[in-house]
Amino acid sequence: MRSTKEKAELCRALHAGAEPTLSAACWDVGTAYLLAHVGVPLIDTTSFGAMATRGLPDAVGLATREFMLGNASEIAAAVDLPVQADLENGFGDSPEIVAQTILEAGTTGIVGGSIEDATGRPADPIYPLELAEERIRAAAEVARALPFPFMLTARADQYLWGRPDLAEVIRRAQAFETAGANAIMVPGLNDPVALKSVCDAVSLPVVVLIGAGPTNPPEIGCDRRKAHRRWRGHGSRGALGLCGHRPGSNRRARTRRLAGRHVRPRDHRHLPEPPRQFLTGKLATGRQY
């Protein structure tokens, strides 16, 4: 089993590679094992999936730091892969609370995590830019002091909360880069022209979230080294379709077509298989819900 530092270095290398990286999210140890089995190189946790195991909704402030870090710690200990955690909004409004979350995350075995600029309050869903930047700066300062290279992803959640302002997203992405983030994520943004604008506006890897929008992510005409894919949240159920065929093996599950999706016979859940582009690296797209 790799050490946390070795996993962290692998995570950084995957983000810096010449090809886009596909990661997928799991919600417990069992789903982590399945994703590791099919050759996914990088695993994320998901608050959507973790909360669903408790029969609770996501994105309304019910996920606690203790629960999400406990979930991530179990997953990180179970697989010999880098694991990044869904750290919600840092589990509090103030930069100090966000910093404490990163400090505690650094003891769990995970090698990275995402911090949202969403408050979790529908009436006032997005933090002001100045506060959002301060929160990322506080997180980055703690992350840099950890004994391994923690991958800090800053999220601009405007599109998820019905505020599709591309100019504001770009301002935030640039501010988060200045504040010390290592990657940018814009969940819900799937327009290829807009995504290219975000990629061109920052020097960091950009993450495209598969699942909060079209199933097949678009082509983006940006540097392939800057674009990474994540299949997360409820969309991660689709990634489990990979379990019918392990890349590199000669064994293939028989499939049939159902509503335009490949489905394994007798699979009552009808989990769709990911598009073949995910296995060939054809798409140049960016990344986790």
Residue ranges and their predicted role:
Residues 2-14, 20-230, 236-244, 277-278:
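Alpha/beta enzyme core
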Residues 2-4, 232-283:
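Extended, intrinsically disordered, low-complexity segments
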